A protein has these predicted regions:
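Substrate-binding clefts and catalytic carboxylate motifs of secreted carbohydrate-active enzymes
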Residues: 2-172
Length: 172
């Protein structure tokens, strides 16, 4: 009721006729989302396995897949892509058990998400969060900033950068 006239105005004013995009956040899901049908493209931001189910990538992947399937069932003709997904990683921190914050966990996290994407033919794209670590406001939750980058702040690659290079080179 609020968004549809607004979206229609945007479409009318956009001379380039670009797709109208909905970018969701963690609180929006296939049941609660109020605007999925009126946009042209769904972009889903999710951090299953990081902000919830941390350390449980099998459970995180199942939740992610269920959610993506729910959006597809609701909007079967809409392209869906992942706009944000990632896990904080301390560069140089390694753990044989791939615990959270380790470079191994970040790679396993990205691999788990990639397996979900690859199993769903209607997923049209993926955009990992983030290219490089970056500064954030000082607080006790993020020591030294957001560390979800696949490169450090000085642009040194983490293990994840090598993993993504291999993954994306293999996509046809």
């Amino acid at each position: 009721e609020y968004f549809e006239p607004l979206l229609n105005l945007v479409r009318e004013l956009d001379e380039q006729k670009r797709p109208a995009t909905l970018v969701t956040y963690e609180g929006s899901n296939p049941v609660s989302c109020k605007v999925a049908e009126i946009c042209d493209l769904l972009i889903i931001n999710r951090y299953r396995g990081w902000y919830d189910t941390e350390g449980n990538l099998r459970g995180a992947a199942a939740l992610l897949k269920d959610e993506l399937e729910g959006f597809h069932k609701r909007c079967p003709d809409k392209p869906i892509m992942l706009g944000e997904y990632g896990a904080d990683t301390i560069a140089g921190f390694h753990d044989i058990n791939a615990r959270i914050f380790s470079e191994e966990y970040q790679v396993d996290f990205l691999r788990a998400y990639g397996e979900v994407f690859d199993s769903l033919p209607y997923i049209t794209g993926e955009h990992v969060w983030n290219f490089a670590d970056f500064a954030t406001a000082e607080n006790i939750k993020r020591v030294g900033g957001n560390k979800k980058g696949v490169f450090t702040r000085d642009r040194s690659p983490k293990m994840a950068a090598h993993f993504l290079k291999e993954r994306w080179e293999g996509i046809s």
